């Protein structure tokens, strides 16, 4: 797995749409785990020394550290609940993120002007990535990155990833790249406002303000660094990621997929049209058909810039969410074709009603604030299980119906 694929994995596991199994990942006792971890730390010094890490930095990095059981737990298990594309996009492209994205668009206008001029990456896409990765900096991760990566590195299926990124993180410390205090990030080692892994920090992070530091914990330098990353992956300046389209009856699943890419002029000749009826602006551009929920849901022709977004995270649903959130921040509307399963964003009134209904039924969710977080989703899963329906923890109008039907 190359460094770019590792970036995709590390950012993917950090997304809040996934819910992980709450099972113990320790196959041995904590004492045995600590002993094995300490042995790894001692033996890994040889690799760190070879990579140019000083003994002083190495000892400071590992002082007092033990393996992180939560990291082992998450690394050992795949997500228990996987949202279908419709629910993923609805959960990702929220009114709150759209409004906040537009506020950031105004707040950082001059900086975004300069970033877009230099790297050519659409500012709305950069803001969408920021919103998707850390909700505009509100949750950048509170894990000690050295502890997380060394925990991944000493055992488990991501040991190679953990060790390579651990060396990169130690190099960051050696170069004084980290703000005061421990290096903090996600459990998989992604850091800063736009969640770069250490190796990609070393390759792509930029010093935007010229102070001699590449500070991805600063919003502007994180946005500039992600712009540099996307530009180096082949971002096509001045072009979009794709189009929502209307399909003629004869074009269906047999035409979909990346291997069936063709020019927009050939798609038009087949009768595929943009929603709204406008012509495709560059008939020679190549695109492939993506049907996230089959022929009954929205259909998209995806261009090269969509593939570039996927260099950040390889999931189609992630890249579609980034593209759609970017369009909404720009002022665009939601998809015209409805999702076949009825997935849609809840109104504020509905969110409060779900929380109040769950409390009335005896579920513990914490404060009623209209934010459907971890506790609310856990309560929804219990409600779904009780009612014998698919358990995914996703808040929909059907949850309100379920609450109203219960005695």
Predicted segments, located by residue:
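Bacterial N-terminal signal peptides that target proteins for export
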Residues: 2-17
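Short glycine/proline-rich, acidic loop/turn segments that cap or connect secondary-structure elements
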Residues: 11, 285-300, 348-356
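C-terminal segment of classical bacterial N-terminal signal peptides
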Residues: 18-30
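Proline-rich, low-complexity linker regions of envelope-associated factors in Gram-negative bacteria
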Residues: 28-33, 334-336
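Mature N-terminal segment immediately following signal peptide/propeptide cleavage
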Residues: 35-63
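A general alpha-helix detector
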Residues: 40-47, 111, 148, 354, ...
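Catalytic glycan-binding domains that act on GlcNAc-containing polysaccharides
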Residues: 53-284, 297-302, 306-326, 331-348, ...
